[in-house]
């Protein structure tokens, strides 16, 4: 029993930025092993875009892990709060979505998350179920439990207040409503990104304020770096891997990450144990394993998770064909730009380079091709047409210039 609990806690802590209330988590896991009684784990997602990428799955993978140790996952789609817009980390007021946009974006979430989570022990919730019913009286009671001074402890709010930038009252409501979700759902544990710590602590505080006889533990997970290894994975930055992408594109993108970033992806995305990952590192260190083969295993694992082993095998074969013969892949990702855009800006915006300075160095080093011709002029600008831009041997993208 003690050995099982020790292993469980080690895996739960894996990759986490911070855990608040570890003793309570241990108590919950122990009770599950003794009585088979499951505990409630909550994680919320605002459906501001229709598709999930690997950055989102860091939390979902941790939810799946917790299911192995007794969690009943409540996967919260914040259809109500998405209409406010999470201001976390923003230096200006964020434009909210309307309900039609939110519900449209949420349509594919269930199909996507069940590629990772055990459906039997997962409940998908929408926070409009209780927040719509809260009403004016309930909202005032909720606001009365928190002070403006406490709100201004949040770095992003404090910065905007100091710089005389606008902060709407509605934005103050976001962490309160997210915290109230924990009250309504009776969460034992809440997961969130490390930028969400303040909001998660509000939930813990409100559970006490509303008289619940528990105080949720908190697990914060890091934001996954995108393919560039610099900025967080984001569709808007072009450095993402979507979980609904074609297998070949998914495999090729994962193979494009640096060897150092590969270990970050292993820790946060792979189902391999920490011991197995250490064995892989040991193999590379002692030259019994090649980094490319280890990266191929990671790419194969991730493709198989969202498709199947056969698709993963075919994607690996396709990548080997492209890599060895320096051929263009059959499936290319696409980006649209306006006529006149410069090659330096394109390389940065599609996530091939973290900065225009790096893009300039890559061009000077002969590493950038357009339609398989080496780019020598860093001031090159695109005219209307279709192009394939390439960085190194493995990174390709189709450009549609309008």
Swiss-Prot record:
UniProt-listed Enzyme Commission number(s): 6.1.1.1
First-listed, main subcellular location of the protein, grouped into a coarse class: cytoplasm
Cross-referenced PROSITE patterns: AA_TRNA_LIGASE_I, S4
Catalysis performed (reactions): tRNA(Tyr) + L-tyrosine + ATP = L-tyrosyl-tRNA(Tyr) + AMP + diphosphate + H(+)
GO cellular component: cytosol
Glycoprotein found in the keyword field: no
Short sequence motif named 'HIGH' region, residue ranges: 47-56
Binding residues for ATP: 235
Pfam families linked: S4, tRNA-synt_1b
GO BP annotations listed: tyrosyl-tRNA aminoacylation
Leading EC class: ligase
CDD domains named among the record's database cross-references: S4, TyrRS_core
Residue ranges annotated for the S4 RNA-binding domain, each copy included: 341-401
Keywords noted in UniProt: Aminoacyl-tRNA synthetase, ATP-binding, Cytoplasm, Ligase, Nucleotide-binding, Protein biosynthesis, RNA-binding
A single MF term (Gene Ontology): tyrosine-tRNA ligase activity
Subcellular location per the Swiss-Prot or TrEMBL entry: Cytoplasm
Motif ('KMSKS' region): 232-236
Subunit annotation: Homodimer.
Protein purpose: Catalyzes the attachment of tyrosine to tRNA(Tyr) in a two-step reaction: tyrosine is first activated by ATP to form Tyr-AMP and then transferred to the acceptor end of tRNA(Tyr).
HAMAP family from the UniProt entry: Tyr_tRNA_synth_type2 (MF_02007)
Family the entry assigns: Belongs to the class-I aminoacyl-tRNA synthetase family. TyrS type 2 subfamily.
Protein's UniProt name: Tyrosine--tRNA ligase
């Amino acid at each position: 029993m003690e050995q099982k609990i020790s292993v469980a806690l080690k895996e739960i802590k894996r990759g986490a930025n911070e855990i608040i209330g570890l003793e309570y988590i241990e108590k919950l896991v122990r009770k599950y092993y003794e009585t088979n009684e499951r505990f409630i784990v909550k994680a919320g997602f605002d459906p501001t875009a229709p598709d999930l990428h690997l950055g989102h799955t860091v939390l979902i993978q941790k939810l799946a892990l917790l299911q192995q140790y007794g969690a009943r996952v409540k996967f919260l789609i914040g259809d109500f709060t998405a209409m406010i817009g999470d201001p976390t980390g923003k230096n200006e007021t964020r434009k909210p979505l309307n309900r039609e946009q939110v519900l449209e974006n949420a349509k594919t979430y269930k199909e996507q998350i069940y590629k990772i989570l055990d459906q039997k022990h997962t409940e998908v919730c929408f926070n409009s179920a209780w927040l719509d019913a809260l009403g004016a009286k309930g909202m005032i009671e909720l606001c009365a439990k928190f002070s403006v001074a406490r709100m201004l402890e949040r770095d992003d709010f404090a910065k905007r207040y100091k710089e005389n930038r606008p902060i709407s009252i509605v934005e103050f409501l976001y962490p309160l409503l997210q915290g109230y979700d924990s009250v309504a759902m009776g969460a034992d544990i809440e997961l969130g990104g490390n930028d969400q710590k303040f909001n998660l602590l509000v939930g813990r505080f409100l559970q006490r304020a509303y008289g619940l006889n528990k105080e949720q533990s908190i697990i914060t997970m890091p934001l996954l770096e995108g393919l560039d290894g610099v900025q967080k994975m984001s569709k808007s930055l072009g450095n993402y891997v979507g979980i609904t992408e074609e297998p070949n594109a998914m495999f090729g993108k994962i193979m494009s990450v640096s060897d150092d970033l590969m270990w970050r992806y292993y820790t946060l995305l792979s189902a391999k144990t920490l011991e197995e990952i250490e064995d892989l590192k040991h193999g590379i260190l002692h030259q019994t394993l090649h980094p490319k083969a280890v990266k191929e295993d990671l790419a194969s694992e991730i493709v198989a998770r969202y498709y199947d082993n056969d698709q993963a095998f075919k994607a690996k074969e396709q990548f080997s064909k492209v890599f060895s013969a320096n051929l263009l892949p059959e499936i290319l990702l696409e980006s649209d730009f306006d006529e006149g855009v410069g090659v330096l800006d394109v390389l940065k915006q599609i996530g091939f380079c973290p900065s225009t300075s790096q893009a300039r160095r890559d061009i000077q080093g002969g590493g950038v091709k357009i339609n398989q011709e080496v780019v020598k002029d860093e001031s090159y600008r695109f005219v209307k047409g279709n192009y394939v831009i390439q960085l190194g041997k493995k990174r390709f993208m189709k450009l549609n210039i309008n």
